[in-house]
Design a protein with these regions (language model features):
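Low-complexity or membrane-interfacial segments used for flexible interactions
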Residues: 28-78, 84-89, 95-104, 110-202
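Cys/His-rich metal-coordination motifs, chiefly Zn-binding "fingers/knuckles"
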Residues: 1-31
């Protein structure tokens, strides 16, 4: 085989040209394929002084989920995510016990099984959560409401709030489709924290 850059002859299977360092076709074939990236778009579709409602669509505009926060009292906050046929996809329940002003939540499957806890790390300028059952951490800031999901120190998803949008709108990007509802659930967690902070100021 020959280097496509300098023409140097090499043994078959050589990954980099010893003459100029150019990557060969063998190296490209051996490199792992980049993971697929999925995107969903979460837009507010009506809200009251207490609760938010959202529609979640894919890039083609297909409705994938509906979501709503449910403020049961001044101190209890929950949310639900539904499929388009109104079947429940995920429930988000605030844990009753508050520690150092942290708001912790349980993400619960339709069969009642715990998917993960969402444990808030109290920080001055960030929304920071740990999802211990999934080995995921979530970091975001108060101002932009953009946040990133990490597993083993590597980013696996991100949520970006649309700045020039009417109401609260988010782009949700991720590489692990099995965690799709978890990412959406964490958007709802942040919405519940926002609602709680708003109620405390009243």
């Amino acid at each position: 085989m020959f280097c496509t850059n300098c023409g140097n002859q090499m043994a078959d299977g050589t990954r980099f040209c010893p003459q100029c360092g150019t990557q060969t076709g063998a190296a490209a074939a051996a490199a792992p394929a980049a993971p697929a990236v999925y995107r969903l778009y979460m837009d507010a579709k009506g809200l009251t002084m207490l609760n938010y409602k959202f529609e979640v669509r894919d890039a083609a505009g297909n409705l994938r989920y509906r979501a709503a926060t449910v403020t049961e009292s001044m101190f209890t906050y929950n949310a639900r995510i539904y499929y388009p046929n109104d079947a429940e996809a995920l429930a988000i329940h605030q844990q009753k016990k508050m520690t150092m002003m942290a708001m912790n939540f349980d993400l619960v499957a339709p069969n009642g099984g715990l998917v993960t806890q969402a444990m808030q790390n109290v920080k001055l300028t960030k929304y920071s959560y740990t999802l211990p059952q999934l080995g995921i951490t979530v970091d975001g800031d108060f101002l932009s409401l953009n946040f990133v999901f990490y597993r083993n120190g590597q980013p696996i998803g991100a949520v970006r709030k649309k700045v020039m949008a009417w109401g609260d709108s988010y782009e949700v990007e991720y590489t692990d489709a099995s965690l799709e509802k978890v990412f959406l659930g964490m958007v709802m967690v942040v919405q519940l924290v926002i609602a709680a902070n708003r109620n405390r100021r009243r």
